[in-house]
Amino acid sequence: ILHSPIYKYMFMKNNIALHWFKKDLRLADNPSLNYLSKNYEKIIGVYIYDDINPIPKIGSASRVWLNEALKYLDKQLNGNLIVLRGNPKEQLSKIIEWFDINEISWNRCYEPWMIKRDKDLKSFFNSNLKVSSFNGSLLWEPWEILKNDGTPYKVFTPFYKRGCLEAKEPRQPEYLEINFFNHNFKNTDVSDLNLLTKKKWEKKIIRNWNVGENYSTEIMNNFYKDGLNDYADGRNFPIKKNVSRLSPYIHWGQVSPNTLWYELKKNQNYKNNNL
């Protein structure tokens, strides 16, 4: 709810697009955000906690991470991240109507239920505005790396040899300044999503992990500096620096795979160890 009809009228004079955050909780090398920033004056950032569609439940530890990641992202947006809960079709429709959105865009997710949901949403919204989607979480699209018979790989090593070693290099990461709309839209507070259960071990995660995009860059750089030497053996011991500790950042999209790829290629330890 906004405070006055006049405020809504002010939005209509602006060239505004909507980015739907999903598993891409970052600003750097975010293909959807980069696309919108090239075509629109202002961007509205929205995260919707979908508890309506029949989906696998998010694990308890992952919920803790999501809670902290959303708070961090909201700070990056200077408090302008719109957090909502419920059916994405209904929630997005409200935002699109209120802000008079010209285009909605997101980065694709590849779980089967998400593919179906997002296809339905794209068909639903396409009649009234432009809808775009991008690959923001994979080095290659699933249909780009296939066996000779046209079916997907099920074993990692053949996929690695044909994908990582033989396929064309993935796109270069792109880092643009993103201008988010400064608004007074009243939305759900992250704490109201009830992602935390007040169990003691949740505080340990928060205390021992720095959850946020900039921290992922720091961890990546430390791993490339100290973790590549003796990686072949050291990766089997979680206590050693040879374990990257990047998994949760990758899962929630706080670092792009393209950034990881090209930063690794520039690293001298990578070259010295023939990884």
Predicted features along the sequence, with ranges:
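Generic secretory/membrane-interface signal
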Residues: 1-3, 23, 101, 253
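Terminal low-complexity, poorly structured segments
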Residues: 7, 21, 189-192
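Glycine/tryptophan-enriched, flexible segments
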Residues: 152-275
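Short, Lys/Arg-enriched N-terminal segments with co-localized hydrophobic residues
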Residues: 1-11
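Trp/Phe/Arg-rich N-terminal binding region typifying the photolyase-homology
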Residues: 10-168
